[in-house]
C-alpha cells in the first residue's frame, strides 16, 4: 500500500511572469485557494498522509509559511529544496531518504484532476502491490503533452514528451503511483 507522496513544486513558472518572479506559481491563488492545495487534496483523497514537497532553492520559507508541517490538514508535510528543477528522476534522487524502501505516489504541483470516480480510482491505485500506474487521459492535441503508447492490456510501451509525430492521443497527466 502506498502511504507516501511527493509533490514537485519547483520550476520557474516563466509563462506566468512577472507574477512568478516574487512567488512560486504553486502558491498563486486558483479560484479560492493556492494551487498547491489541489495536488495535496488529490494525495489526501488517495489516503496518503505523508507528503514531501520539493521546492526551488530560496522558496522553502513561502511554502512553510503557508502549509507549515501539515498538522492542520491532518497530514505530515516534509520539504526539500532543489538547486535547479531537473524533472521527475531528480525527485526520486532527492527524496531517496524520505522514500526509503517504500512505494510512493508522485504528482506534479501544477496539475488539476477531477472526475466522477476519481476518489475510487485513487484509492485503487494506492493498493497497488507491484508495478506502477501512470494516469493518462485522451486529448485532442497530443503534440502539446507527454504522450504514452499502450498495448491492449493498458501496459505502457513508450512515453514521449511533446512528440512531433503522435504515438497516441493519451496524455500523461502528471500523477504516478
What are the language-model segments listed below?
Residues 20, 67, 160-163:
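Short, flexible helix/strand-to-coil boundary loops that buttress conserved ligand/catalytic motifs
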Residues 11, 110, 138:
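Active-site glycine-centered loops adjacent to acidic/histidine catalytic or metal-binding residues
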Residues 114-177:
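Conserved core of the sugar-phosphate nucleotidyltransferase
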Residues 1-7, 15-18, 28-29, 33-108, ...:
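Conserved N-terminal catalytic core of the sugar/cofactor nucleotidyltransferase
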